[in-house]
Design a protein with these regions (language model features):
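A short LG(V/I)-centered, amphipathic sequence patch enriched
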Residues: 42-58
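Residues in the recognition helix of alpha-helical DNA-binding motifs
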Residues: 37
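C-terminal effector-binding regulatory domain of bacterial HTH transcription factors
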Residues: 1
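The N-cap/first-turn positions of alpha helices
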Residues: 4-7, 31, 62, 69
Length: 72
């Protein structure tokens, strides 16, 4: 399993920017591309990374991945 740097950057931006729309704006890519990147990571890791809803929250797996993604 290979986690792509672009996927990790998108995931990190979602957390740092507080949502998918703002992450897309910060990365100058579509919101769909950000969603697909995070979904790709979730598929590869076989676990959800964020709890979607009114507030965006990291899951335990998401917290561990975010620590790694900060280095990318």
């Amino acid at each position: 399993m290979r986690l792509e740097n672009s996927e990790l950057r998108a995931f990190r931006a979602v957390i740092e920017e507080g949502g998918f729309k703002r992450a897309a704006e910060a990365l100058h890519i579509s919101q769909s591309a950000v969603s697909q990147a995070v979904a790709g990571l979730e598929f590869k890791l076989e676990a959800p990374l964020v709890q979607r809803g009114k507030d965006l929250r990291l899951t335990e797996v998401g917290k561990r991945l975010f620590e790694h993604a900060v280095d990318v």
